[in-house]
Amino acid sequence: MKRIVLLLALLGSEVWLSAQARPAQLPALIENSLALPRGTHRVSSANVDTPAITVRGSNIDLDLRGVELVGSPDGTAPDKFAGLAILIDGGENITIRNARIRGYKVGILARNVKNLTLSGNDVSHNWKQRLYSRVEKESLVDWMSYHNNEKDEWLRYGAGIYLKNVEGARIDRNIAKQGQNGLMITHSKNLTIWNNEFSFLSSLGIGMYRVTGSRVMHNKIDWCVRGYSHGFFNRGQDSAGILMYEQSSNNVVAYNSVTHGGDGLFLWAGQSTMDSGKGGSNNNLFWGNDFSHAPTNGIEATFSRNHFINNRVEENWHGVWGGYSFESLIIGNRFARNQEAIAIEHGQHNVIADNSFTDDDIAIRLWANETQDPNWGYPKARDTRSRDYLITMNEMSGVKTPTQITRTDNIELDATETIEIPAAPPRIKNGIDAMIPPGARRGREFIIVDEWGPYDWTSPKLWPAGRSDESPLKLRVLGPPQKWTLRSASGASVSAKAGSVPGEITVTSTAGRVVDFAVTLRDGTGRDFSYSRFFAPIDWHLRFYDISARTYEPPDMAMTQKLPVILDTRADRIDYLSGRAIAQGLPNDHIAMIGEGVVELPKGAFTLRTISDDGVRVWVDGKLVIDRWDVHESIVDEVPISGGRHELKVEYFERTGWAELRVEIVRH
């Protein structure tokens, strides 16, 4: 069969093309080694099934140095990015080097490939969700779930690089920043992942699902995080530096910096193990990594057998959360300033030895719960008692509670028996020192997450010093050290007209009852950076009802209004979130609310937004504009609303579990 390869004719040019309707010059299909002309090539892609470029064949080497693929127009919001830049569709001995890819849902996707090399590619600034958690309170909308990927469900969360059914790969010197996910791998084996930087991402640095026999070494995987606001909440929302799920076994993870992630490591046996009690993500070796400064767990490893040796684990909620771990080694690690350094429920035959604990609240906590779900397959198939620990040769300094152990049997202390420890994995030749250098930023106070993810500290930024709704509002001036000047201020006065980074300014709203200001500073290089806030108080009259006796779905609010009002209150906003009662005096579950209010908006274009779990309906001036009247997890609905006076009505109900209701008006 004759092979046809189409080449770009426009050297170094900038053109905007569609992957579905492209001129003949664009290489839609590449089947041989070649060099693409340098330059920025703007090629849209509707989805992962219509890639900008497809690579198909074997023994192909593409050096894309100087080539940039851009999938979306400049100024497009990151959650609107779509499509796939490069698809590697089968074959053997394929190399992609030095590409720069931005503005897509997925940068590079390789499937059914043997002996793949991805080296020196920059897949930064691709797709990421808009986040709705705020300084003071999280939103459940931002939670993710990576528990199933048998049908590529992970693709809904985007990726810089996505590998499926890849056997034998060298992934090195790639960069993914300021997207949602860095490197995502499923159903693959025998990979070497080293000298990469997957940092400042809003979800995962590296995600692994049914990945075996692979090495992850010498990588910088820092600030892969969401769901954290320093001093307010630490939830993580299933973000992590490294995620290993569903029978990911026999891997080596060594000499990586995995700090400031939602979790550092998030390892889980998988749903098949939850149902059957068999298998797990087992026999992985974690050696010499830095798993520090996680809002939740430095290491979360559950329902599995693994070795954790010589790691640094500092300033996490839990240093190790090891629920249902068995036959695992936790040896020679340095724990410091964790709330609970090691916490294991229902663990068995684990060894905790030769670790140091410094200034932790609790060093070792072991326990079993009094009851377990009788319908859960895992305890039906396995003995899940907490038992059979060897705890020896650990050093403690400044620890408040050395051990806290309940409902746990057969603990051996200070034994002299020999413990067989795996050898240190050999470093890869030319492997980088991935660790954060002395004097650089360390600590959870340096995690700042805005609506697009973690701040990377490379550019100036204004951020609240405390609550974001304070008046006057104190703003920190963050970023590289330099001078700044006040560029503009509308709707507010500013405490200073010039200053230095780092620093602080105070902003006082002058707009009256409605807070509507924007402040712009200019740094020493001429870059502008801004902070704005809009808040229109609404005169809400809120009435709550107990609907526990009303079992029909959805609730009939005409009938609900005939019930006794259990809480009658007034507020200037609707903003509820709780896993229990959303307000004092209400039951935890089965409630309904009717709210009526009036708002006066200034001139301009606005959006009325709701975040709801469960049902919500909204009327504006008597017209139904949002109608999501069913049981659902937290979801966002938006409709436009104009300036002026409006009468608003909100109906809401919540059945069981977590409840969330936010009704707000935001300026365009």
Question: Where do the PLM segments sit?
Answer:
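Boundary at the C-terminal end of the N-terminal hydrophobic targeting segment
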Residues: 17-23
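Extracellular/secretory pathway-exposed regions associated with glycan biology
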Residues: 532-607, 611-668
